[in-house]
Amino acid sequence: ENSSILVVTEGVFGMTGDLGILPEIIELKKEVPFRLLVDDAHGFGTLGHDGSGTGTQLGCQDGVDVYFGTFAKAGALIGAFVASEPNVIAFLKANSRSQIFAKSLPLPIVATARERLKLIRQHPEWREKLWSNTLKLREGLQKIGYNVLPSESPVTPVLTSGSTQLCTDIMRKMREEHGIFVSGVAYPVVPRGVVLIRLIPTAAHNDEHIEKTLNAFEAIKDFVMAAANKLSA
């Protein structure tokens, strides 16, 4: 049955690493006809037995009508793609402003993306390594005393009380004093008075990298906790 309703959600919510409730959303199609578009920027390449994303991980990929992915995360490249039925793709080609007023990806980028798709499928051990690194990082941060939010993906969010200035200071200290890049998120992306530091380990990291990161977080812990306590006082 055709429907003009389009439901849009994420496979992995990039700030917290939570997975979208795709099976529950798809189940609603039995009551209300709609199409489902899933932005799976963080799930593509990292989730599912073959890296094909959150839908595969949750066993409901066939219920996704329009699938959006990017090569900029797991693919370490540039560019993105939309996968759907031929008539949907034809509609997007003719009506998407970003498609009409943009140039195609350079051929070397396309060729590289195709090869990296093959590598993602052929090397499940890379995903195993990714998850091993993710668990080591999370467990280490928790042992130090940081509040690591539950996450079902490699996205590792560390939450603390603090100001926008604290967020900036943490990023600066990690980068300039320890040579580690972290992504800081402050108000209005998160509630006022909250700072979220986001880390995303990769399969290319090793135990030495993780240990260095944990040591750096331990080194700035007193500074972070003092700022958090000052805000809550």
Language model: regions and residue ranges:
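Active-site phosphate-binding strand-loop segment of PLP-dependent enzymes
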Residues: 1-38
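A short glycine-threonine-serine/GTX helix/turn-capping micro-motif
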Residues: 78-79, 96-105
